[in-house]
Amino acid sequence: AFYKNEVEQRHWYGLWDYGDIMHTYDAQRHCWRYDMGGYAWQNTELIPTLWLLLAFMRSGREDIFTMAEAMSRHSADVDIYHFGDLKGLGSRHNVVHWGDSCKEPRIAMAGHHRALYYLMGGDPRIGDAMDDVKDADYATLNMDPLRYFYKKEEMKLPTHARSGPDWSTYCSNWYTAW
């Protein structure tokens, strides 16, 4: 109910915004940090799609399902790169949804973002999006998630895969596709 009320109050509608929420509230300014990269749009950070769908299954509340549905569709259509060198990656919480250079596979993870919604409703567009991310590991060859931490000339391998956010995403994508 809180997220749905925020969508109504803040008019987060339209192709780019509907189904997403802001990530961090600014207590000093008494507003969402809509203008600060790293704090603005949530882009499925903290997996609200999963816990909202689980809350719906426990309660049967339609308002919870419609918010989870909107978030699942938004993340599948807006937050994921569907073609090109970044196919399978997603943009972390940015001022605009595709904003800065934080492109990571975890934002596009098939298993916890969309698989449950797909199984509940069979939306073929969600199935297409899950298929788009199954080879996200190849996209990190084009954009290393840790490129700002390591000098390219000192790297022994072409990219990095963190055990938590990256490997768990790859395994989730492969398992979901299987």
Predicted regions and their residues:
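Catalytic cores of extracellular degradative/oxidative enzymes
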Residues: A1-W178
